[in-house]
Amino acid sequence: MRIILLGAPGAGKGTQAQYLMGKYGIPQISTGDMLRAAIKAGTELGNAAKRVMDEGKLVSDELIIGLVKERIAQDDCKGGFLLDGFPRTIPQADAMKEAGINVDHVIEFDVPDEVIVERMAGRRVHPASGRVYHLQYNPPQNDGKDDETGEDLVIRADDQEDTVRHRLGVYHEQTKPLVDYYQSEASANNCQYHKIDGTKAVDVVSDQLSSLLG
């Protein structure tokens, strides 16, 4: 089972990716992890990527596709894989198709921007332990303080409202067009497209995925 997860940052893809990996026994493939592994292993593609990154440049789609092909040829991907955070753009999706990397299911997590801003802007973190709270869904016992140590909670830079809105803007500009792209692919019977309401409770979303994917 080969799956692509689509959705804005904060839409709940990461949580459901963990669920799908456990249920179907397939690895999650993230481009960041792949790059780090290839560089560490000193593969030809890894060395090429390192040279580009050392110059402060972005790794080309061609290189990333090469890494994806290399990764999905490994034994643990025989039963399928889960792509999260890739492809991000139409050219990347086209390059994947040209490289013969086919997928069975594309799952879009649909969550309104304002809900995502509320989700992320409400997060508070205890830096020393990594404990995460949420002002609305999981508030600390004492405002702004960690339950166990009483130490101050902080807002991560990634969760600041202006940062979240910027990331959402990038998503809508670059990645949202993939929704139309993969809906067209589904119409041509090249994959199945599923749109999930990501505002529902985590276990409800997991159950829905389970019934959709079988």
Curated annotation (Swiss-Prot):
Keyword Transferase: yes
Pathway named in the protein's UniProt entry: Purine metabolism; AMP biosynthesis via salvage pathway; AMP from ADP: step 1/1
Claim: Transport is one of the keywords in the record: no
GO cellular component, one term: cytoplasm
Sorted UniProt keywords: ATP-binding, Cytoplasm, Kinase, Nucleotide biosynthesis, Nucleotide-binding, Transferase
Region (NMP): 30-59
Region annotated LID, chain positions: 122-159
Catalytic activity: AMP + ATP = 2 ADP
Main location: cytoplasm
Single biological process term from Gene Ontology: AMP salvage
GO molecular function terms listed in the Swiss-Prot or TrEMBL record: adenylate kinase activity; ATP binding
Residues holding ATP: G10, A11, G12, K13, G14, T15, R123, V132, Y133, K200
Binding site for AMP: T31, R36, K57, L58, V59, G85, F86, P87, R88, Q92, R156, R167
Function: Catalyzes the reversible transfer of the terminal phosphate group between ATP and AMP. Plays an important role in cellular energy homeostasis and in adenine nucleotide metabolism.
Family as reported in the entry's similarity comment: Belongs to the adenylate kinase family.
UniProt subunit comment: Monomer.
NCBIfam families registered for this protein in UniProt: adk, PRK00279.1-1, PRK00279.1-2, PRK00279.1-3, PRK14527.1
Protein name per the record: Adenylate kinase
Source organism: Pseudoalteromonas atlantica (strain T6c / ATCC BAA-1087)
